[in-house]
Amino acid sequence: MAHRIVTQVVVTGARVFGRAFAEAYKQASAASKYQQKTGKSAGGSSSSGITLDEACKILNVKPPQAGETNLEQVMERFKKLFDLNDPQKGGSFYLQSKILRARERIEAEVREAERKAAHEKELKEGWKPKVYKDR
């Protein structure tokens, strides 16, 4: 009689575990397909989880136009807001981190635009090696 109860417990547990595993696999598969469509990875991205528009609103600056922005103004606003939200002065660490991420996002956008511009310039000019020593 005891072996029958033990067998039922094992079979029921295996069935529950199997269903849970199948459901978890379905959810992971759906999440993977969604990430592939949106182009985002679980490990994070260069956007550091904040959009450029949100970063500009946090620091109250204009979005970079063609990769150009006034970085002095961005740093000025960053320092002011970062110091105002110092936790030792009664500010919020959460707001400080949001301000830091906003500055990093804008700087990353400008760096990426500068890198692309330099790459385009190099492609436009072309690579002109000196083949002969006398020329």
Curated annotation (Swiss-Prot):
Record localization: Mitochondrion inner membrane
Topology term for the membrane: Peripheral membrane protein
Keywords: Membrane, Mitochondrion, Mitochondrion inner membrane, Protein transport, Translocation, Transport
GO cellular component, one term: PAM complex, Tim23 associated import motor
Location (main, coarse): mitochondrion
Keyword Repressor among record annotations: no
Feature: compositional bias, Low complexity: 39-49
Gene Ontology biological process: protein import into mitochondrial matrix
Region Disordered: start-end pairs: 30-49, 114-135
Pfam family, one: Pam16
Record flagged with keyword Mitochondrion: yes
GO MF term list: protein domain specific binding
Region (J-like) residue spans: 54-111
Protein family: Belongs to the TIM16/PAM16 family.
Subunit-structure text: Heterodimer with PAM18/pamR. Component of the PAM complex, at least composed of mtHsp70, MGE1/mgeA, tim44, PAM16/pamP, PAM17/pamQ and PAM18/pamR.
Function: Essential component of the PAM complex, a complex required for the translocation of transit peptide-containing proteins from the inner membrane into the mitochondrial matrix in an ATP-dependent manner. In the complex, it is required to regulate activity of mtHSP70 (SSC1/sscA) via its interaction with PAM18/TIM14. May act by positioning PAM18/pamR in juxtaposition to mtHSP70 at the translocon to maximize ATPase stimulation.
UniProt remark on domains: The J-like region, although related to the J domain does not stimulate ATPase activity of mtHSP70. It nevertheless mediates the heterodimerization with the J domain of PAM18 and is therefore essential for PAM complex function.
Name used for this protein in its record: Mitochondrial import inner membrane translocase subunit tim16
Gene (UniProt): pam16
